[in-house]
């Protein structure tokens, strides 16, 4: 059970805030923007969805490379695997092709804020279908959202999901890259996004 009092104290800890600023500055200093932007532009020009996904994955990985050794994210911490995670239709197809997992195509796609809020309410706290024994079973094919999920905190205290509670989690700012991803897919009108659990529903619990 999450210790909400401890979490709220951590949210307001000045030392944590200062740490987040320092780490963010160092990640931005390390970030290979030229390479990342070149890959994003190649993805935008790519003709096949598969090629777009591969190029965007390589671009997104630049965040993880820049953050190496600076952040609490590591194998065994699966808090973010219990968060709502929006992925593009082409990412879902790539995951299905690489893993053999059966994919369900949502009846409709939507990215407005009300939809995203509903998705968060529905899936925050629900384990990703591909979380196995506390680790991602499709790590090489994990979504872009997972690749750019970089927590700039001292530890993972603020990563814990608390139902009904909004927790301020210090993250690297990826808005510029998010826009590059949007344009690679064809712009806002082609944003065929849904939560990963919409494409790959969690397996039923046979113990119930």
Tell where the protein language model's regions lie, with residue ranges.
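Short loop/turn segments that flank or connect secondary-structure elements
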Residues: 1-79, 83-135, 139-208
